[in-house]
A protein has these predicted regions:
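Non-catalytic linker/capping segments at the edges of enzyme domains
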Residues: 1-43, 47-48
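Active-site helix/loop of acyl-thioester processing domains in fatty-acid/polyketide metabolism
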Residues: 34-39, 57-81
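Hydrophobic residues in beta-strands and at strand termini
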Residues: 44-46, 90, 137
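Short histidine-centered catalytic/ligand-binding loop motif
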Residues: 46-60
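Hydrophobic beta-strand-centered segment that forms part of the acyl-chain substrate-binding groove
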Residues: 69-101, 106, 132
Length: 144
């Protein structure tokens, strides 16, 4: 399906099958992003089945967490987006079983795209990963 043909998600809370945030997706992460100031934020405790190397959260799971919270940062600005490009820099291993904090903010809004930045830190504030994404604006949605 082409991005321009994607159906709108007018009420994101009614979409419950998303791998990142869907509460009715038993295989997903079931993230619960919330708005705090001009950022989207979320906490997550990775379980053993989220690991790559023993005791370390798999990089794909970290990508998914950052991607999801960055999309919510755009959504909280009233923009329904899909990720066009994303870059992640891993700084430290994210430990399984510990609370992780994901945050993201919109850095720039353009005509067709949004630039978003995200980061993952542990409880001590140690930077574990940081990301930048270009997201394609599908359509404006109701502000949350």
């Amino acid at each position: 399906m082409k991005l321009k043909d994607m159906p709108p998600v007018e009420d994101i809370d009614s979409y419950t099958r998303c791998f990142g945030c869907g509460k009715d997706n038993p295989m997903g992460l079931q993230l619960k992003p919330h708005k705090e100031g001009d950022e989207a934020r979320c906490e997550f405790i990775a379980k053993e089945h989220h690991q790559g190397w023993p005791g370390i959260v798999h990089g794909g799971v970290i990508n998914t967490m950052l991607d999801e919270v960055m999309a919510y940062a755009a959504l909280y600005q009233g923009l329904h987006c899909a990720t066009a490009r994303m870059e992640v820099r891993f700084r430290e291993g994210a430990p399984v079983g510990h609370k992780l904090h994901i945050s993201a903010r919109v850095a720039e809004v353009r005509v067709k795209t949004v630039e978003v930045e995200g980061k993952l830190v542990d409880d001590d504030g140690t930077l574990l990963a940081e990301s930048k994404a270009t997201m394609y604006i599908l359509k404006d949605v109701k502000k949350r």
